[in-house]
């Protein structure tokens, strides 16, 4: 049994579950604040992961991707929003969509603040022994996972939040074309995440994270370490 690998996997899984719960609860809270009580009445503002987990998107799909050895992504149950209850439906849908990724970025910043306040905190492996070292390693992992979760969800393909945001800026034929493309969202994601890197050695996700997640993570890392 590969204990170090299991510890690392458990740390990442815990960070991902926490990130997903915060992400989905933020959607529900934003909807409630903007006039729609549906998600809150259905228990979506809750720390209980079972209220947010989608059996396929949160459990089965990530397991398949881990076994396949490629990038891993997951999605939770969609937060129910009835646009007729919103004060300004077109604007509020975008704000609700942005609330999820924004909450993950805030959570990553909170992790950095906690690390900054920990005496003698240094960049350690999440596999290091000792409770303090395990906590430090987990916080660094949580920073990375939450930033990745935030920016991955901003990709403009359903069921990701970026799809709802992009619609605000499209009109006419462009909007119609986008709705047609949405039907092929999952095949497109599979091509981008697996086919292009393995066949053509073109890793669009790595490039995208390189210009979004990496600079922000390095900035938070310097802040956390007092560098």
Give the ranges of each region predicted by the language model:
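Hydrophobic transmembrane alpha-helices and their immediate loop junctions
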Residues: 1-227
